[in-house]
């Protein structure tokens, strides 16, 4: 894998300044102006990039009341379904090209975590400069392969992965001629107990 990767006009390497990514996620609360304000706050705080997530409720889960699709882990969303949660959490696709333009005018790199093959196609039309692979997608090899084929840098989280999963994902990228991969150490618990982080 390459030791030096360009994301926009930012060089990512061991001796480069830290590349700071602000995650918007669902914090816009389905309000476009709030999304823009979040990007401005990120820029004002010194972020280099803003990251969103690209999915719809129907591309990420099933509209189903089955117990497997109910939220019951003692959160503020208990009693709702995943589909209903994602209806209030996703970033509308019609916003995304507009948000990208505004972010770039602010001097931010704008990119996303796709969650299915159609969202990769959509982000390619938007010409995002880099992709973020969420921990829960690292073992979806057709998905990894499609992202790798774009030739763009890939930031890949490893939260639920075994070493074999990480090796397979990296090998898949390499097979597609893409060695611009950055691995992130991730603890897939929200919030993560400090004892799970293994940080010294």
State the predicted function of each range:
Residues 1-21:
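N-terminal amphipathic alpha-helix/helix-capping segment at the start of soluble metabolic enzymes
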